[in-house]
């Protein structure tokens, strides 16, 4: 059974690699809006949560260097799954195809079609969950992308704060409170808007706050303690709910608000 299963994984991996080969015929995912640059240097693949947000990102991006791949629907939790099983998921398969570097035994980072992979999800708890699912996949099945510093998280705003003629963008509640404390003077009224999702933003706003290399924030994903990271991913994303209970209870007092 083991050799047969291994053969199935290699066959599935080769199938994806052929579709994502950087030379010869290239069949890219239909939802991918690729960038125009032929040189990989400076290029970025943004994996965006949902078709609506993907549409805004496609309109607001720098077409020369930024590619957009919307991921509709629920992202697969790949923790504990074999690569063969993972490749049956269309969203994950499309991502591997777009990246071009293959997976498993056929993985080759030199064939990656972009300099950076950027995960872009809503700034709320749902968006954080989707980001966690994608990071789980990358950590388990494409870990070299993380080790080589090629994976980043975009930081879209959760709030827009208008104070007089000035506009500020806050990534979370703490950022909002900091801005109000530093910028609000006297009885000046603050007009605060909470975004429901990326799809609610106009393309120009998404560019100015999240896509523009001159004004955005990007967080590089790093693995500082391999053993501890492996334990946390297994406990939080694995099938055993009892493994998550101690983690949640240890941090219960840190939760001031629940975004439900």
Where are these regions (language model features)?
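N-terminal start-of-chain detector that recognizes signal peptides
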Residues: 15-21, 39-43, 88-92, 125, ...
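Charged C-terminal transducer/switch regions of large nucleotide-driven machines
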Residues: 11, 29, 133, 144, ...
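GHKL-family ATPase ATP-binding module
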Residues: 1-74, 107-109, 116, 218-260
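An acidic- and aromatic-residue-enriched active-site/binding cleft used to recognize and process polar
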Residues: 51, 73, 123-126, 156-158, ...
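Short hinge/gating elements
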Residues: 15-16, 31-34, 75-82, 116-124, ...
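Metal-dependent catalytic core segments for phosphate chemistry
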Residues: 41-111, 129-135, 139-153
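Conserved, well-structured core segments
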Residues: 44-49, 119, 196-199, 208
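N-terminal assembly/transducer modules of large multi-domain enzymes
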Residues: 1-7, 120-129
